Amino acid sequence: MNDLPMHGRVALVVGASKGIGATTAEAFAAAGAAVVLAARNAAALAAVAEGIDKRGGRALAVRTDVTDADSVRNLVERTMATFGRLDAAFNNATDGPPPAPLADIDPDEFDRGIHTNIRGTFLGMKFQIPAMLGNRSGGGAIVNMASTAGVSGTANLAAYVAGKVGIIGLTTVAALDYADRGIRVNVVAPGPILTHHLRAAGPQAQRLAGLSTPMRRIGSATEVAHVVLWLCSPQSSFVTGAVIPIDGGQSAGNKPPQMSRPGQAMAEPGHGRSRR
């Protein structure tokens, strides 16, 4: 008996050319799944697929535009033609305009972010779900990528936040629609994760991002991948419609670096009492 949790299963990872997507695809392969990789960058996809193949896994790379229905339909059809089934999907593509106050955002840039996040996730599930319903074993698991920004909001990121809130809503409805048909749908909501964006921002930005979490550090793509893998495995068979933060406690609330003793603040200068 094989003890790999995804042995004999087929996983589809959208946005698999780099970062969290590539790391998650590699995690699926290491857990025994055949993996289908999707993204716009064909060369980067091929490199990830080659790495999986060299480590003894099975990978298929399919260049895909998640906002185009025909492209997403082709992705799922290629998956079924190659492997004959689809058991797990991670819809991870994301986009958004540069940070700016809401009134300063270009409408076309706003639309682009919404299309990638909401339309891309919708199209992914639209074609993934029928394929999963056809599995002899019945059903499958879908994980969609949101963000803590979709849970609590972030200033100057209106398009990104709106997109992530929309993904959470789509996930909730899909989970309800298919809960009694063997398909589970959940959301992961990462906080600050060390990917190429945060690496490019430099050490100071990384330090500040870490300090924004109660755990006082940033997360890794591997930590996100582990949660996605669990949500797609039999170990989470009673979990659907959930939003799982992966944020070091950031969405739970604020934790000041140093807490004052009760009443201490009132004893400080300027609060009605003076020191002798």
Regions found by a protein language model. Name each.
Residues 17-18:
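Conserved glycine-rich cofactor-binding loop
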Residues 100-102, 106-111, 198, 209:
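Substrate-binding pocket helix/loop in short-chain dehydrogenase/reductase
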Residues 125, 163, 171:
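Active-site helix of classical SDR
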Residues 147:
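Residue(s) in the substrate-gating loop at a strand-loop-helix junction
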Residues 130, 176-180, 237:
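Alpha-helical segment proximal to the catalytic Tyr-Lys
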Residues 187, 203-239, 246-248, 271-276:
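C-terminal helical subdomain
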Residues 104-111, 115, 203, 267-268:
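Short, well-ordered secondary-structure patches that form non-catalytic structural/interaction elements
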